[in-house]
């Protein structure tokens, strides 16, 4: 049977501030990118998120990012690569400990926001991420954009590189994501998102902002949990894939 992994960013609440409906998202996705406290999340939120993921049978991954709570980790940070590597190790270690208290373990790593976008082409930061992951557990896959520098370096280092696509994001013709600062960068219509995902999963292709078709091979598809209507989009995506005979299953 053909299958696809659906992942979502979760655990991004902080203290009395709540973001997204993680409990509802867990009913549709197979993998959870859990914030590790640097761009969002706190120890209580992280542990609760791990508990709910375990209860829902959803795989846990470390959603690591820049140390940038006020910017939600979406801004580029010009950080020394060795310091970035230490920050990544710190975040993965924190999630590993909190996941263990709920009888779970971290199964993969996905960089977040500004860091995710930077390491598409920023070799020094991409290498810092790869070195950090390898120093902790060389069996941890790294999730990233197809053709990115971080996935190239991960493969070269003997790590598993997992390509992902985004259900609710618009693409440039070169395969990069349209900047969130531009109109139309984030898709909000569940039907449009479902069609977008079906093209990715069934045809290994996406329609870019200029109307051209780009070939893309993705092992996982991300549905952002903090977008307006995120739960409805996740439900629509899962239903569309199921109707097309595509099973939803974690990639690891």
Curated annotation (Swiss-Prot):
<dbReference type="GO" id="GO:0005975">
    <property type="term" value="P:carbohydrate metabolic process"/>
</dbReference>
<dbReference type="InterPro" id="IPR005501">
    <property type="entry name" value="LamB/YcsF/PxpA-like"/>
</dbReference>
<dbReference type="GO" id="GO:0017168">
    <property type="term" value="F:5-oxoprolinase (ATP-hydrolyzing) activity"/>
</dbReference>
<dbReference type="GO" id="GO:0005524">
    <property type="term" value="F:ATP binding"/>
</dbReference>
<keyword id="KW-0378">Hydrolase</keyword>
<keyword id="KW-0547">Nucleotide-binding</keyword>
<comment type="function">
    <text>Catalyzes the cleavage of 5-oxoproline to form L-glutamate coupled to the hydrolysis of ATP to ADP and inorganic phosphate.</text>
</comment>
<comment type="similarity">
    <text>Belongs to the LamB/PxpA family.</text>
</comment>
<dbReference type="InterPro" id="IPR011330">
    <property type="entry name" value="Glyco_hydro/deAcase_b/a-brl"/>
</dbReference>
<protein>
    <recommendedName>
        <fullName>5-oxoprolinase subunit A</fullName>
        <ecNumber>3.5.2.9</ecNumber>
    </recommendedName>
</protein>
<keyword id="KW-0067">ATP-binding</keyword>
<dbReference type="Pfam" id="PF03746">
    <property type="entry name" value="LamB_YcsF"/>
</dbReference>
<comment type="subunit">
    <text>Forms a complex composed of PxpA, PxpB and PxpC.</text>
</comment>
